[in-house]
């Protein structure tokens, strides 16, 4: 399955003008990002917490450097948020369709909300804004022993 996604990513890079031949795709693995989306269902994230369908508008999984990402990359998140803001896109439809200025999506590590607005001018979509916030995760917990005469 990952090989098929890589083929899709390579052809996307070619169509977008990021590469000149499919052979170059292997040397440019960081873009474009490939993600897949689905309507929300109850699921457990990597911490064990259960996310209910009402907690999110859609589910999203993204690939980075040929592998499924353990969470959600910021670049993929803003792209998904923008696609959700454009009526009729696959992302917009997976999120329930219609006009929207934000989308909440579930990913393997939790949930993320992204705001976006875009408008169509002469049949060309222009992104006006995209916003998101992220929560920090604990990187370390411990104690530091400082001698009392240090102060």
Summary of predicted features, one role per range:
Residues 1-151:
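Non-transmembrane, aqueous-exposed alpha-helical and coiled segments at domain scale
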């Amino acid at each position: 399955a990952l090989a098929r996604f890589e083929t899709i990513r390579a052809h996307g890079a070619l169509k977008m003008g990021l590469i000149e031949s499919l052979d170059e795709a292997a040397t440019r693995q960081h873009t474009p990002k490939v993600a897949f989306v689905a309507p929300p269902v109850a699921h457990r994230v990597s911490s064990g917490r259960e996310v209910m369908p009402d907690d999110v508008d859609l589910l999203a999984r993204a690939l980075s450097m040929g592998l499924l990402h353990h969470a959600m990359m910021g670049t993929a998140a803003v792209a998904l948020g923008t696609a959700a803001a454009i009526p009729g896109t696959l992302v917009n439809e997976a999120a329930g369709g219609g006009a929207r200025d934000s989308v909440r999506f579930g990913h393997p590590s939790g949930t993320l909300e992204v705001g976006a607005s875009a408008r169509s001018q002469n049949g060309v979509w222009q992104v006006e804004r995209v916003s998101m916030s992220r929560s920090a995760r604990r990187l370390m917990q411990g104690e530091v022993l400082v001698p009392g005469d240090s102060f």
